[in-house]
């Protein structure tokens, strides 16, 4: 019995040593990367790469299936695209420049060779842990608006931050559309999910959450701006901005209330539904539509 136990012990030690040796050889010969390349789901490298395109680009077409998208202003008059390359096969970005139009896309999940369930499970864990590197950052040319921007983004959060977005059509199926510190002009942004927008100038644009709620805070309205939500809609403006513009608000099944930030615990004032103002010589109008409640919150004007 002792000999049998000792035999199993020796066998275990030997196989463990051999396993470590094979693992070391695999790492040295890029065997791990070869295995990761078989993953059906994207596995991203931690290093970042950048593509740059010049003034010859006037139109931008973006379609992303596997990457989260961030849009911001470039530091110069060129387009900068930053991303983490994919270790796994067939998940990298693809760019194509035709005349004055730049197209950017990635590929949908590819078919992978048959692997055991254990290896597939391991690759799934590795893929999930690398998702923090799945973002693509688009830097738009500073001070030089493009003629047209068409964007389709289907994963994660879509972020527009410190950006000047003009002549754009954006459709995103990610879980959140977040806009902050930006200028949106002559554009239409649509998502089935949540919209959060902060400290942003809106000019002649439409933003819509088809199936969820919408939160807008400290926005500036220029021209005709439309905000639409399936669920509740919250709009927070300074007193000065609220009094400066015309309103056209209606809720299909909810009510419209007006609150002040100084008394958040109050029940607010219920407004007529629809609620509309027609101030003479005022061309800036905020149109708000929702199937649920609409809350208008007024804050003290900044000095």
Where are these regions (language model features)?
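N-terminal Lys/Arg-rich, disordered targeting/topogenic segments
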Residues: 1-5
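Hydrophobic membrane-insertion alpha-helices, especially the h-region
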Residues: 6-27
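Right-handed parallel beta-helix
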Residues: 47-59, 68-72, 94-187, 195-199, ...
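N-terminal beta-strand/beta-hairpin edge segment
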Residues: 64-91, 136, 140
């Amino acid at each position: 019995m002792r000999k049998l136990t000792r035999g199993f012990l020796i066998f275990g030690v030997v196989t463990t040593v051999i396993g470590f040796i094979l693992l070391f050889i695999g790492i040295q010969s890029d065997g791990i990367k070869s295995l990761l390349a078989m993953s059906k789901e994207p596995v991203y490298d931690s290093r970042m790469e950048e593509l740059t395109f010049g003034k010859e680009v006037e139109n931008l077409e973006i379609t992303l299936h596997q990457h989260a998208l961030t849009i911001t202003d470039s530091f110069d008059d060129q387009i900068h695209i930053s991303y983490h390359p994919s270790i796994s096969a067939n998940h990298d970005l693809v760019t194509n420049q035709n005349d004055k139009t730049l197209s950017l896309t990635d590929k949908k999940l590819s078919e992978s060779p048959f692997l055991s369930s254990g290896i597939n499970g391991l690759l799934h864990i590795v893929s999930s842990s690398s998702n923090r590197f799945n973002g693509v950052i688009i830097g738009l040319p500073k001070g030089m608006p493009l003629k047209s921007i068409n964007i389709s983004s289907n994963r994660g959060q879509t972020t527009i931050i410190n950006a000047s977005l003009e002549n754009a059509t954006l459709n995103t199926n990610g879980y959140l559309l977040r806009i902050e510190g930006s200028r949106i002009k002559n554009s239409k942004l649509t998502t089935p999910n949540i919209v959060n927008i902060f400290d942003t100038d809106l000019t002649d644009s439409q933003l819509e959450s088809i199936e969820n709620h919408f939160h807008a805070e400290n926005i500036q309205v220029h021209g005709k701006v439309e905000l639409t939500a399936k669920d509740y809609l919250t709009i927070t403006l300074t007193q000065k901005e609220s009094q400066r513009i015309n309103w056209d608000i209606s809720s299909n099944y909810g009510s419209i209330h007006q609150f002040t930030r100084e008394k958040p615990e109050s029940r607010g004032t219920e407004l007529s539904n629809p609620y509309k103002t027609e101030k003479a010589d005022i061309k800036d109008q905020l149109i708000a539509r929702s199937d649920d409640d609409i809350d208008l919150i007024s804050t003290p004007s900044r000095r």
